[in-house]
């Protein structure tokens, strides 16, 4: 983290999740719209970005950042959300269809994203990007920051506190089952 405090890190302007993470870490990011990142890397206004491998390639940011780490801090989250009131008006066969196709599409998206990430990492390596792994010695610190940022978002009611608590309990139960504790 001390090394990161020396960096000029891009934060997607208006991103409350990123802001909470940086607040929890004590880092001071440079908020910019995504359209200004490449130019800002080129001019030195920023020297560090957070992006998935495919994004770093598509936006050509990797040409300005010769080092990359694989810290798992960025998740893509999405979904088709409909109100319970609307969903309940659908006939049972359409409800089942929506659930079945949604689950299949979600699994396919995860599989394709993982495949694209693996391909993108190979492309980045071919272009001379150096991958660092020092963070793995401090993995618990990184995840502790994530947890503190989530708690801040719950306190600020960005994430409803009751939903945050339910999610934390479900995660703890999952981890306990997975480790057998």
Predicted regions, residues:
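N-terminal secretory/targeting leader peptides
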Residues: 1-181
């Amino acid at each position: 983290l001390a090394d990161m405090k020396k960096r000029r890190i891009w934060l997607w302007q208006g991103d409350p999740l990123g802001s909470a993470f940086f607040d929890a870490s004590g880092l001071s990011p440079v908020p910019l719209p995504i359209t200004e990142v490449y130019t800002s890397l080129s001019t030195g206004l920023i020297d560090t970005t957070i992006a998935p491998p495919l994004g770093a390639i598509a936006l050509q940011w990797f040409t300005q950042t010769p080092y990359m780490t694989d810290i798992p801090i960025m998740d893509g989250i999405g979904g088709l959300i409909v109100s319970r009131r609307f969903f309940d008006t659908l006939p049972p066969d359409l409800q089942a269809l929506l659930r079945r196709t949604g689950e299949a599409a979600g699994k396919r998206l995860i599989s394709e994203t993982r495949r694209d990430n693996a391909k993108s990492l190979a492309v980045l390596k071919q272009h001379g990007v150096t991958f660092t792994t020092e963070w793995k010695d401090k993995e618990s610190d990184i995840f502790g920051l994530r947890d503190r940022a989530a708690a801040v978002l719950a306190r600020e009611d960005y994430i409803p506190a009751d939903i945050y608590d339910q999610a934390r309990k479900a995660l703890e139960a999952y981890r306990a089952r997975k480790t057998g504790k």
